[in-house]
């Protein structure tokens, strides 16, 4: 959106008080504030590593009790809410005529299923809690209905309205939040303000493992941090963007390896070409970002068309691959004058979705310093001096030194030794590429 010139205010609210948080804090013998602060910090650290932009505002529910109480008060005054005999305050779902318009569900059908778990304190089985009466050993705040704490749904409405106003453009969240959470947000927000709550809802699909939804209860749950221990942040980001955000995301080692392989193709195409602005004629203007002064290039037009189609990053990446094919064609004919501007445009477009901003050499070699890069070799023979690596002991070799020794063997026309070094490195997932300007290497 920012690449299109829109001014974006990004809000990510945080529920820092609910039943699970209270229970976990008790189990850990720590304060709720300490528990939530620790998890919020970990979340932001992981998001930063994945290149997720920080929000402009990150409100926490406990910091907006005043706004929450005020919104509940408005609903009470308009007869959309009531206080039950147990002290809880509930939203009266039947009072809101548009209930179900987001999810397509109908009240009569919902009532049939809801009666099984009917709470005696409610007037109707679908009514949901806005304010929970205080319980012993739980945090609580003052309100016109007595001490208590907010329900989950009202927190989100109050915080988003506080930060963005009574009406805003885009609301996101997981597919599982569409009903009842987002349906309830619409009901309480529109009843309180009289305004349409949101223009566009964007619901992302679940992460699935072996065709099952990832969840703690199924035992197939893992954290971003655990995956980051095995894959680079850009590889994980690419893996996510290679699927449409509304589609299920199928997690597997095979799919992450595919993401690594495809990023390798991109960075191999960019390798040896100047970064944007490093060469005369390769500047920032006209590279494909929409503006009022320069027309879109054909590739940029296709890229933006894909992104305009419900944020179709999968199709946008397909456009970037078409650019790679043309870049490689120009490189094969040593036509750098054509390859370099196209590579600059590729970086510019990919940068819109947070990809291909790294150094190609660093990515392909898996290290920021190609001259000190090493590889662990378990079997085979080291070049030079007859050093033997046979056995189980793991040794470390310098890739650049081995390339130098291979070059010496080639100059001496010792092709057997040259091939042996190449094969040894290949066995350890190091691929050598001989070109007009010497030998380069990358990790397989």
Residue ranges and their predicted role:
Residues 1-51, 437, 441:
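N-terminal, positively charged nucleic-acid-binding surface of large information/translation enzymes
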Residues 25-32, 56-62, 174:
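The substrate-binding groove and active-site-proximal loops of carbohydrate-active enzymes
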Residues 46-49, 71-74, 78, 82, ...:
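Short alpha-helical functional segments enriched in proximate histidine and acidic residues
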Residues 1-4, 9, 45, 66-275:
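Alpha-helical recognition segments enriched in aromatics with Gly/Pro capping
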Residues 213, 223-283, 288-444:
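Structural preference for alpha-helix termini/caps and helix-kink/transition segments
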Residues 11-19, 40-43, 53-68, 86-95:
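Short, glycine/charge-rich beta-strand/loop segments that flank catalytic centers
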Residues 33-36, 40, 157, 317, ...:
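Hydrophobic face of alpha-helices
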């Amino acid at each position: 959106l920012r690449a299109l010139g829109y001014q974006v205010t990004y809000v990510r609210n945080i529920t820092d008080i609910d039943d699970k948080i209270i229970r976990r804090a008790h189990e850990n013998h720590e304060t709720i504030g300490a528990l939530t602060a620790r998890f919020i910090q970990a979340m932001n650290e992981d998001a930063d590593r994945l290149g997720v932009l920080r929000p402009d505002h990150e409100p926490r529910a406990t910091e907006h009790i005043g706004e929450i109480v005020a919104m509940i008060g408005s609903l009470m005054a308009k007869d959309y809410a009531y206080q039950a005999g147990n002290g809880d305050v509930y939203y009266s779902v039947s009072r809101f005529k548009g209930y179900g318009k987001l999810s397509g569900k109908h009240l009569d059908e919902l009532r049939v299923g809801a009666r099984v778990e009917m709470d005696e304190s409610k007037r109707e089985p679908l009514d949901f809690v806005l304010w929970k009466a205080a319980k012993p050993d739980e945090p609580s705040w003052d309100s016109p209905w007595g001490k208590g704490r907010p329900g989950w749904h009202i927190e989100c409405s109050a915080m988003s309205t506080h930060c963005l106003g009574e009406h805003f453009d885009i609301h996101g969240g997981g597919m599982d939040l569409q009903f009842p959470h987002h349906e309830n947000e619409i009901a309480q927000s529109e009843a309180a303000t009289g305004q349409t709550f949101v223009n566009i809802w964007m619901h992302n699909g679940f992460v699935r493992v072996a065709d099952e939804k990832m969840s703690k209860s199924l035992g197939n749950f893992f954290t971003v941090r655990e995956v980051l221990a095995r894959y680079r942040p850009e590889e994980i980001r690419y893996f996510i963007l290679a699927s449409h955000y509304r589609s299920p995301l199928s997690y597997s080692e095979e799919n992450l390896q595919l993401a690594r392989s495809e990023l390798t193709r991109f960075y191999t195409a960019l390798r040896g070409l100047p970064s944007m602005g490093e060469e005369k004629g390769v500047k920032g203007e006209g590279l494909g970002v929409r503006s009022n002064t320069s027309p879109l290039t054909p590739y940029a037009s296709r890229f933006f068309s894909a992104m305009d189609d419900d944020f179709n990053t999968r199709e946008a990446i397909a456009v970037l691959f078409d650019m790679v094919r043309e870049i490689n064609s120009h490189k094969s004919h040593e036509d750098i004058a054509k390859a370099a501007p196209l590579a600059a445009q590729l970086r510019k477009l990919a940068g819109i979705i947070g990809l291909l901003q790294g150094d190609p050499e660093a990515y392909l070699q898996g290290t920021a310093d190609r001259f000190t890069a090493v590889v662990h070799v378990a079997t085979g023979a080291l070049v030079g001096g007859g050093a033997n690596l046979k056995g189980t002991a793991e040794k470390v070799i310098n890739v650049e030194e081995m390339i130098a020794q291979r070059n010496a063997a080639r100059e001496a026309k010792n092709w057997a030794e040259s091939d042996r070094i190449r094969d040894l490195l290949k066995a350890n997932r190091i691929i050598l590429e001989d070109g007009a300007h010497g030998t380069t290497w990358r990790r397989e």
